[in-house]
């Protein structure tokens, strides 16, 4: 008996001391759920485990039925028919599954969402932002907004579970909205251990004296412009001549579309731009209005950097949407290499540094990439362009780097090249007489090296914060007798501390932007040109002074 007892005890000891070979326990760290989710990029919607949905196929009059399974969308095609009632906004086409009641909207360009209710081109809000339906999702404190459909918001007064959620712009997304007619768009964020509201950092649209510009396609335009491209006067939307037309003041949703007892330009059907009905040669027709898009230069969805590195901070392209990456084909081997940075200043034009092009590359060997956070990893919203031509300043001095500026024209089959998005946007050009106080803090960005001795460029976009030096400190005697001209400006990190903490540009950042906040817009003051090493304490970087080249830029863009 004692022997048997001893054997049992020994076996128990082995059981308690041997490692668990068959069971691999996973311990949760933090409060994050392990329940998988799926995100449908076509509708910008997130689905939970085992949830199903419909989405349009790329070709044919069919749609796909999808189901979220362990984080993967499993889809197959199903037949559909036209919906019995309109359910899609902004000109979307509604299709309903043949054998069950779910529906799907095929959205026109620029709109996404279950009901085509999200405007991907809306980069700012008008008025209080009550009608804002864009994709901004960052609060003023830099926090990411919570999805309106989150179960954590089910007891909040405004969530995607309200009966009138669609009307208020709420849904299965985390984009800023203003459902309660507050002063500007807001959202819920997780702060100090609880869910609370925060105003969003969404920029307000510029207010011109007549508001004769429009944002995106002008779907939300509510100004008073009333003339077409042929200078014809618009007909009132309640004119008896329009009886029988699709878009009039008598539509059930006319107020939501901006139609009424007036003749102001509107875009009720999500066309390319605002339009109106006119009489031409005694015939009723329509024409686009004589209007231009509002300038959205210098606006961005800034996200607070999370990782500090030598020379600056890792950042996201949405914080610097004007940043361009320029690549050139290798001479003796297939592939391409990163060349320099650049700055998008209009849809088809990028500024850079002249010294990047001293080898006189053929234009067809160059490529510009916009919207990329990681230098060599394609981004979800990136845009790539070949180069039509590039212009290097005729008086560029390769020894002193005086007139270190170049202009690249992007190639496109239309008059528009870069499409504006949260990842792609233009930096503002400054007024010729702009004067900023000495030591104004500005930002630079690029994919350059972390330090001069590094053999590699940065894998990810970086940003650095520097201050504008006074002209009295931007001289040859302060920079080891290097030539400094009136076409250059100096900027550097003035904080105390060792060299490892100094923000600065470095090799590979050349051609990139030095931008400063002017009237709440990031404005291009300098182009990264040259420096003495990288990140040296009390040694500023040298930038091409953009205000000296405004006429040169405009003249070359007109050619």
Swiss-Prot record:
Cite the position(s) of the site with description Important for single-chain activity.
Answer: 462, 509
Q: Where are the glycosylation sites?
A: 149, 481
Q: Which reaction does it catalyse?
A: Specific cleavage of Arg-|-Val bond in plasminogen to form plasmin
What residue stretches are annotated with the Fibronectin type-I domain?
36-78
- Posttranslational modification: The single chain, almost fully active enzyme, can be further processed into a two-chain fully active form by a cleavage after Arg-308 catalyzed by plasmin, tissue kallikrein or factor Xa.
Q: Does the keyword Zinc-finger apply?
A: no
Q: Which GO terms describe its molecular function?
A: phosphoprotein binding; serine-type endopeptidase activity; signaling receptor binding
Where does the record locate the signal sequence feature?
1-17
Location of site Important for binding to LRP1? 99
Instruction: Name where it mostly resides.
Output: secreted
InterPro entries attached to this UniProt entry? EGF-like_dom, Fibronectin_type1, Kringle, Kringle-like, Kringle_CS, Kringle_sf, Peptidase_S1_PA, Peptidase_S1_PA_chymotrypsin
Going by the UniProt record, its keywords in alphabetical order are: Cleavage on pair of basic residues, Disulfide bond, EGF-like domain, Glycoprotein, Hydrolase, Kringle, Plasminogen activation, Protease, Repeat, Secreted, Serine protease, Signal, Zymogen
For region Important for binding to annexin A2, the annotated ranges are: 39-49
Q: How does it assemble?
A: Heterodimer of chain A and chain B held by a disulfide bond. Binds to fibrin with high affinity. This interaction leads to an increase in the catalytic efficiency of the enzyme due to an increase in affinity for plasminogen. Similarly, binding to heparin increases the activation of plasminogen. Binds to annexin A2, cytokeratin-8, fibronectin and laminin. Binds to mannose receptor and the low-density lipoprotein receptor-related protein (LRP1); these proteins are involved in TPA clearance. Binds LRP1B; binding is followed by internalization and degradation. Forms heterodimer with SERPINA5.
Domain notes for this protein: Both FN1 and one of the kringle domains are required for binding to fibrin.
Instruction: Write out the similarity annotation.
Output: Belongs to the peptidase S1 family.
**UniProt name for this protein:** Tissue-type plasminogen activator
């Amino acid at each position: 008996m004692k022997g048997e007892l001893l054997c049992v005890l020994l076996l128990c000891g082995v059981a308690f001391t041997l490692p668990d070979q068959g069971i691999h326990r996973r311990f949760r760290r933090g409060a994050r759920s392990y329940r998988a989710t799926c995100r449908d990029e076509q509708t910008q919607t997130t689905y939970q485990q085992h949830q199903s949905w419909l989405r349009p196929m790329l070709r044919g009059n069919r749609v796909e039925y999808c189901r979220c399974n362990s984080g993967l969308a499993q889809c197959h095609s199903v037949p559909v028919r036209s919906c019995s009632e309109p359910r899609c906004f902004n000109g979307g086409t509604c299709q309903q599954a043949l054998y069950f009641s779910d529906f799907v909207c095929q959205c026109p360009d620029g709109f996404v969402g279950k009901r085509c209710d999200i405007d991907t081109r809306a980069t700012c809000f008008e008025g209080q932002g009550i009608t804002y339906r864009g994709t901004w999702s960052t609060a003023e404190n830099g926090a990411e907004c919570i999805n309106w459909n989150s179960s954590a918001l089910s007891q909040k007064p405004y969530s995607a579970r309200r009966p009138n959620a669609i009307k208020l712009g709420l849904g299965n997304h985390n984009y800023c909205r203003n459902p309660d007619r507050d002063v500007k768009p807001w959202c819920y964020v997780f702060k100090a251990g609880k869910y609370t509201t925060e105003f969003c950092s969404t920029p307000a649209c510029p207010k011109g004296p007549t508001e004769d510009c429009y944002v995106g396609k002008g779907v939300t335009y509510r100004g008073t412009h009333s003339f077409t491209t042929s200078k014809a006067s618009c007909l009132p939307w309640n004119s008896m001549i329009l009886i029988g037309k699709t878009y009039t003041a008598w539509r059930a949703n006319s107020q939501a579309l901006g139609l009424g007892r007036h003749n102001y330009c509107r875009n009720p059907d999500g066309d390319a731009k605002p339009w109106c009905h006119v009489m031409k040669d005694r015939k009723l027709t329509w024409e686009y209005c004589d209007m231009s898009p509002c300038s959205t230069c210098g606006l961005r969805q800034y996200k607070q950097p999370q990782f500090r590195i030598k020379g600056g901070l890792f950042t996201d392209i949405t914080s610097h949407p004007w940043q361009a990456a320029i690549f050139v084909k290798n001479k003796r081997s297939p592939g391409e290499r990163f060349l320099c940075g650049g700055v998008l200043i209009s849809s088809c034009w990028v500024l850079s540094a002249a010294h990047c092009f001293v080898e006189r590359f053929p234009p067809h060997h160059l490529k510009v990439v916009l919207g990329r956070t990681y230098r060599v990893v394609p981004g979800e919203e990136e845009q790539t362009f070949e180069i039509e031509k590039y212009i290097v300043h005729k008086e560029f001095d390769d020894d002193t780097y005086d007139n270190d500026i170049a202009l690249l024209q992007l190639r496109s089959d239309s008059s528009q090249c870069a499409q504006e998005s949260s990842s792609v946007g233009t930096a503002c050009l400054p007024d010729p007489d702009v004067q900023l106080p000495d030591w104004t803090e500005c930002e630079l960005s690029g994919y350059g090296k972390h330090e001069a001795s590094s053999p590699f460029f940065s894998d990810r976009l970086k940003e650095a914060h520097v201050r504008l030096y006074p002209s009295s400190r931007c001289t040859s005697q302060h920079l080891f007798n290097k030539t400094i001209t009136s076409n250059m400006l100096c900027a550097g990190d003035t904080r105390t501390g060792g060299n490892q903490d100094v923000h600065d540009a470095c090799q590979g950042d050349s051609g990139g932007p030095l931008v400063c906040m002017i009237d709440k817009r990031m404005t291009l003051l300098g182009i990264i040109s040259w420096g003495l090493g990288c990140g040296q304490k009390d040694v500023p970087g040298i930038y091409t002074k953009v205000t000296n080249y405004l006429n040169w830029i405009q003249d070359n863009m007109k050619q």
